[in-house]
Amino acid sequence: MFSLRSLVDYLRSQHELIDIHVPVDPHLEIAEIHRRVVEREGPALLFHQVKGSPFPVLTNLFGTRRRVDLLFPDLSSDLFEQIIHLLSSPPSFSSLWKHRSLFKRGISALGMRKRHLRPSPFLYQDAPNLSQLPMLTSWPEDGGPFLTLPLVYTQSPENGVPNLGMYRMQRFDKETLGLHFQIQKGGGAHFFEAEQKKQNLPVTVFLSGNPFLILSAIAPLPENVPELLFCSFLQNKKLSFVEKHPQSGHPLLCDSEFILTGEAVAGERRPEGPFGDHFGYYSLTHDFPIFKCNCLYHKKDAIYPATVVGKPFQEDFFLGNKLQELLSPLFPLIMPGVQDLKSYGEAGFHALAAAIVKERYWKEALRSALRILGEGQLSLTKFLWITDQSVDLENFPSLLECVLERMNFDRDLLILSETANDTLDYTGSGFNKGSKGIFLGVGAPIRSLPRRYRGPSLPGISQIGVFCRGCLVLETSLQQLDIPALLKEPHLADWPLVILVEDLSSALSSTKEFIWRTFTRSSPATDLHIPVSQITNHKVSYTPPMILNALMKPPYPKEVEADEATQNLVSSRWHSYFP
């Protein structure tokens, strides 16, 4: 059975955890301390005295690459490469014997183990008081305190298939939480099924520090692949439970610090938010389902796990990258023709992705692109850059140059309007509505990309810079903007891609900043401007340059920023936190 206290002791012994013993406030103060430590690539934090709660708070468990590797010491892409090798090779005794450890691991993942623990490790409240939980308010305009690491367990009312997902939960009162079910997530699908039957959906929320449970809950697994099964496989041992809940039948996992049981209420919605999210902006107030808690279990010495999200890089970036590294060998198996794939955490993962594919016949690359956009959470990708060249996808400037050198604007740009959009992304035409852009660059280069801008100053443009070969960045404002005039500017004709930003120096300060400012503030259908040369058989041909308007535009939400009072408080107390 997993022990969070043992994990805390281990991290402390590795100088990867600091204990903070002075009283701290879960309203804004803890989050600001956490963000500063993450920015400095610092340790996990255990806050022992949290105002208004008897429970300590653990944050920043995954805040560096080193710590993620410590938490998953035996977990690498080699595991999934072995699976691919086994599945792709003709069966033989020698092959099966060589990979016998996989079979042991697979057997360990089957089923769950009931542990007869006396006394029970959990204390029980049948009249729950959620105000005892030290839920964090992370940003000054957040709608209230939130559970930020909830592992939300549901089962399909249709077939009983389970799902474990992570959906933020806002506290409304001592027994009611908002349930931020997003599109393309299993819990939301289960709630839809329940509402079709006019039934409430049983929901169990685990708060656990088990890294494997957390990793499994956010993994983009194929539908109907149980996350608890995946967790057991990753940690190479069965998950254990003390009992099953008498009403829902859900397992009460031993690895939990807290367990909340209850229901998502059919037909009932309540305004949820705002919330400073992992895109780096506030997601706005919208109506979402509610969770009515009927029981609260917690361990006697429970530790409350939490995280803080915001502008990249935060904890979720390192955990998301670990997942991509682990699952990358599976891409060619799940999506034949796709050799490598990366979603960029710098843009909140869903806004931007790139892939290396095979082009063995005419337009096979487009087939692979459409396959990617039809796969689970990848279907929420906005900008997808595709090439058949061997390029390091971690190096986004090189990837961008590779595609821009090869794009034939008569056939290699495809804009899909009126598609589903990530719930947290407000660049589209409405809530959950947006568009997608596919940018193909395959074969031999067809153009030489400029390295420097040699033209004159441009009307309405205050500064001009270069991100990489072929990509020009112009500083302007909504008031000065004249895109039709820019499209006719002859000195831009040699630049395949032109980006419009408010702050050139910030946009070019790093690749991370460029990606975040460019792709979280634009949508392909509404913000990509390029002259149409002809339309033949419903096929649109274009003439470069592409001008991407990445300015902040109404009604985009605000960028998250700590308030001055909290910043001053944390600065003044810094040496008391870390004496």
Swiss-Prot record:
Transmembrane segments: none annotated. It comes from the Bacteria. One of its GO terms (cellular component) is cytoplasm. GO terms for molecular function: carboxy-lyase activity. InterPro entries: HBDC, UbiD, UbiD-like_C, UbiD-like_N, UbiD_Rift_dom. Belongs to the UbiD family. This is Uncharacterized protein CT_085. It comes from Chlamydia trachomatis serovar D (strain ATCC VR-885 / DSM 19411 / UW-3/Cx).
